[in-house]
Design a protein with these regions (language model features):
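C-terminal subregions of glycosyltransferases and related glycan-biosynthesis enzymes
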Residues: 105, 138, 149, 155-156, ...
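Nucleotide-sugar donor-binding/catalytic module of glycosyltransferases
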Residues: 1-190
Length: 273
């Protein structure tokens, strides 16, 4: 919360919607009560429902949401207001870079924004969610988040937005994303992959769908992709040059892939850039 209330940009409408936490959340919310436009802590319909409620209450011209584990950097809101302030009538989504970090291991890595590609977004969610901001016009055109989704609700919404809105990249670092063992992304297992398959069936090409169907059917393939991703990330942090030279050696042992399955697409789906 401090990363928001301590921003240099003051024209902020800040609402907090908590699903009834039993820790010190209410105590902390009361501490910041004077700096919040609205807050509540009670059982709700899940993350998508809470996000929809927050945006339904919002009256500002530029919108975003920040999960409880994540942070804005000190200059985020000033930078976003400068980039979007003169374009408020257009349906524009702004996205930037993000620093990933782990408090337990003290690991940090900057994940820069990359050029927007609708085709790549249909394959994998490459956007840094805490670093996305959009004009109110986007919300009016795209509509609310799908409350039936649990793991890929943001990706589904981004895909819907990409059909009717302009995505604009900034090189600025806009957020910090905290990694920990209890995250939904890492803990979802087969349920998460089944939901991702549902999303690509809605939005993506038959070729992309076939790759997700393959991964849903083959848990060992998902394991190898995850293993390769982690090894490659560690090598990149140690020596990007060596990582690039041995990337092919880290290829999962998919010797007998079906003819319609491409190893490079599987590599994209793993999330490594």
């Amino acid at each position: 919360m401090r990363s928001v209330v301590e921003q240099g940009y003051r024209n902020v409408e800040y609402s907090v919607l908590d699903g009834g936490s039993t820790d010190r959340t209410i105590e902390i919310l009361r501490k910041y009560d004077a700096q919040l436009s609205f807050w509540r802590s009670e059982k709700d319909g899940g993350q998508a429902a809470a996000i929809n409620e927050g945006f339904h209450r919002a009256t500002g011209d530029i919108l975003c949401w920040l999960n409880s584990d994540d942070l804005h950097v000190a200059t985020t809101l000033t930078a976003v207001a400068g980039l979007l302030g003169s374009r408020l009538d257009a349906p524009i989504v702004l996205y930037g870079g993000c620093e990933m970090f782990n408090d337990r291991t003290h690991w940090r890595e900057v994940r820069p924004a990359i050029s927007f590609s609708r085709g790549l977004l249909e394959t994998v969610d490459f956007l840094n969610q805490p670093s996305l901001f959009w004009t109110r016009r986007v919300w009016e055109v795209v509509g609310p988040f799908d409350e039936t989704l649990h793991y890929g609700l943001d990706w589904d919404w981004f895909l819907r937005a990409s059909k009717v809105c302009q995505f604009v990249m900034t090189d600025a670092l806009l957020s910090r994303y905290r990694l920990h063992d209890a995250q939904k992304t890492g803990a979802g297992g087969e349920k998460r992959w089944s939901e991702l398959l549902e999303i690509v069936r809605r939005h993506s090409s038959p070729a992309v769908v076939s790759h997700y169907e393959f991964l849903v059917r083959h848990g060992s393939a998902r394991w190898w992709l995850n293993k390769r991703m982690r090894i490659f990330q560690r090598l990149c942090r140690w020596s990007p040059k060596i990582a690039g030279s041995v990337a092919d050696l880290l290829s999962p042992p998919f010797w007998n892939l079906p003819s319609d399955i491409d190893k490079e697409v599987l590599w994209q789906i793993s999330g490594i850039r």
